[in-house]
Amino acid sequence: MEYRGYDSAGVALLAGDHKMNIYKSKGKVSNLEESAASKDISGHIGIAHTRWATHGEPSTLNAHPHVSQNGRLALVHNGIIENYSNLKTFLEGKGFTFKSSTDTEVLVQLIQFIQDEYGKDLEGAVVSALRRVTGAYAIAVVDKENPDKIVVARKSSPLVVGIGEDHKEFFLASDALPIVEYTKQMVYLNDGEVALLKVGQKMEIHTLDNEDVDPKIKEVDVNLDTLEKGGYEHFMLKEIYDQPRCISDCIRGRLLADEKKIVLSAINQHRDRLLRASRFIIVACGTSWHAGLIGKQMIEQWAKIPVDVEYASEFRYRKPVIQPGDVVIAISQSGETADTLAAFELAKERGALCFGIVNVVGSSIARASDTGIYTHVGPEIGVASTKAFTGQVMVLTLFALALGHELGSISQMELEKYITELSLIPEKMKKVLEQDALTKDISRTLTYARNALYMGRGFNYPVALEGALKLKEISYIHAEGYPAAEMKHGPIALVDENMPVVFVATHHQLYKKILSNIQEVKARNGRIIAIVTEGDEAVKNIAEATIEIPATLPVVAPLLSILPLQLIAYHVAVFKGLNVDQPRNLAKSVTVE
């Protein structure tokens, strides 16, 4: 796992005599090897970890594994426990003390507390603890009083179990690469799953809801691409189809449909400053900037606070006016985008509250944030962003709704209406993806186009921008997005029988106006492809092709209407024989200017 970067390493080893040896070292794994070389490294079960500091500085003390107060448990963890501060306060009230400044130590102490208080076995205590946790994790836990087992679990952080000979040995890692030399039989744990690995027995998997899961063993080769694509031809296609699950992960623990409320610790941490904000400034690049445009409309509509959306690369250099009452929101999939990070740091220097919306746990923007929200959509490998966009839009939706409700701009009844609809989005996404065969056929007609226009109004305008970006990124077709009303101010001059014009024309308050815009293109023989709400006959009678999305509230529609546009871009690129996952001249994470 060294290729991922780290600042310290550690290992815990169990022998059969209820003895546990733990060795840690700051710096390279070679430092750990040297320090442990002359010590007892016997044992038949072990867990190890390479750490990249998030909570707590790089040090031997903060390195994993972390040990429970009674010395019985050891735990390694990737991810961040978002509510660790509240849990730590609770445990301190129960008499627990802490040696490190990490969130991970809080988790292992919580597991001990549950064992002591409720008499649960290791697996039961882990499950109970994780039900109280908000955040991302991939963990492995051992108990020296039960030295024949390891309990592992994951949420929004990858975890792979390699199956050895006769199911009598197991290997754990964040991905398959470190363990393929030992076995090619892998089980990829899904979010919310807990696995019990016991010496000489087959693995058992359960969900946090205590549902049994049949382990699905995959035979893999040593090609990392094959391992990570999950059977899909490209990462991008896999990530498009991942979106219903990703959005479920994104809202889990935040959108509480039964309790009819939205819970965001980010608001609670800085409630006064957020509620008194005079302005929000969103800084982002590329796809994240498009998500920010949607966020602007939602925050202004629901919280009644003005919002500026800035390209981070422009914002950082133009001597912007930033005041202490401002809240600056940085949006970035990787959390490492150089311009966005620099703009964020500038805002921090000027006294603004810095709010991060990122996907990668522990990234630079995450560490620089005063507060923020992880999208929790999982690693995104394809250069052309897909699930990161929908995750960002969902997080912004939750944030804007929660903020508006706190400020009294949204009634409880209105909030409940949105909560109900948002909880249905993952299933509605699946319905959109079920139309992929139709989308593929429509895409074929765009393969030889040299240009394309994308049009939308209101919340659909940023969707049009994002659809155009996807097409140009991976198919190399020149595509531009515009507000549909701006068509008469220039773009309509480009419309003829060879110009595809893609309209995002779902039902909203400006529907009749965009219908007129579609008629204008039709009158000039433009080739019209439209994303519409199911049952829309008016557009269907005009357009060359239509793709329907399930009926939903207008503000929520971008989460659905973007999916066909992602698929169109993907299929066009495949038809053209292009490298979908690694388009020319582009990088996944732009960490330099």
What do the PLM-derived regions correspond to, one by one?
Residues 48-61, 258-271, 295-331, 478-494:
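Glycine-rich oxoanion-binding loops at beta->alpha junctions
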Residues 275-424, 506-545, 568, 572:
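Glycine-rich phosphate-binding loops that contact phosphosugars or nucleotide phosphates
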Residues 236, 527, 540-542, 548, ...:
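Generic C-terminus detector
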Residues 1-234, 238, 245-279, 317, ...:
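Conserved short alpha-helical segments that host acidic/polar catalytic motifs at enzyme active sites
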Residues 45, 73, 279-281, 327, ...:
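Structural motif
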Residues 131, 243-247, 251-281, 371-500, ...:
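Active-site phosphate/pyrophosphate-binding segments
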Residues 77, 97, 115-119, 185, ...:
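Hydrophobic alpha-helical scaffolding
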Residues 150, 159-165, 169-187, 313-347, ...:
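Glycine-rich, anion-gripping cofactor-binding loops and their flanking helix/strand elements
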